[in-house]
Amino acid sequence: MVGLTTLFWLGAIGMLVGTLAFAWAGRDAGSGERRYYVTLVGISGIAAVAYVVMALGVGWVPVAERTVFAPRYIDWILTTPLIVYFLGLLAGLDSREFGIVITLNTVVMLAGFAGAMVPGIERYALFGMGAVAFLGLVYYLVGPMTESASQRSSGIKSLYVRLRNLTVILWAIYPFIWLLGPPGVALLTPTVDVALIVYLDLVTKVGFGFIALDAAATLRAEHGESLAGVDTDAPAVAD
């Protein structure tokens, strides 16, 4: 049977492959588009470091009769705002709107981490707090952010909707794994818990990025447009 360490190494390798691919794809990006690639590199790069750390056995924190993998939550606290930031760039959010969605996202992650670290029944109250914040985040992703994205080109809007759907659907699975796994009622073994999380992390980070790269290539080839929504043949404009 595959052990936890092996699963963590698989996650690290997958994230590293994604990081290298995103860095290579963005090597010639114009100034307006560069931040999209930097964000993708940050998402998978941070996750790669977290998985290496866990594979080395660092950050395995005993809580009651379970083990909390602290780097997992630190990874999420750092990378999920970057995913939301990327979506916000596509949607064309202003600074106030960015602040709202990133704050909601951070509350979700902090509540999940705190709940995992609490041995008693109070952890479910923290889980509930995170769930409420998650519903608020979904509302913004599906409502105001989608409306904002509709003001952009059809290609950018289509990419936003694809990435939004991927994010919302797969992120909605994480709370159930938390509840059914070691932090909750422990119906899932640690190995199953880790395997599911590794798979979801790879899809929501590396898969997310590859969808963005594919769409960027299509926009460039068919419309002469970049992720930043400008003509790729036009002079680059500083951010």
Swiss-Prot record:
Instruction: Tell me which parts of the chain lie in the Extracellular compartment.
Output: 1-3, 56-69, 118-121, 182-189
Which keywords describe this protein according to UniProt?
Answer: Cell membrane, Chromophore, Membrane, Photoreceptor protein, Receptor, Retinal protein, Sensory transduction, Transmembrane, Transmembrane helix
Residue ranges crossing the lipid bilayer per the database entry? 4-25, 34-55, 70-91, 95-117, 122-149, 154-181, 190-222
Give start-end of the signal peptide. Answer: none
Subcellular compartments: Cell membrane
Q: How does it assemble?
A: Homodimer. Interacts with HTR-II.
Protein name (record): Sensory rhodopsin-2
